[in-house]
């Protein structure tokens, strides 16, 4: 997910995307533990997407409070 796409999203859309990515991260961890994970780079990508979304959420929340 690109930063440009995130800036265009509303808070609710970001929260939905964050929940979806957390579920995916959970499933990827299980697949990794059982040895079924084929694309190991996806774990890193999802983790970074989660961090990116949290960063933009925090920025939007702080902007709305000011």
UniProtKB/Swiss-Prot annotation:
GO terms for molecular function: structural constituent of ribosome. The keyword Transport does not apply. Gene3D superfamilies: 6.10.140.1970. GO terms for biological process: translation. Keywords: Ribonucleoprotein, Ribosomal protein. NCBIfam families: L29 (TIGR00012). This is Large ribosomal subunit protein uL29. It comes from Bartonella tribocorum (strain CIP 105476 / IBS 506).
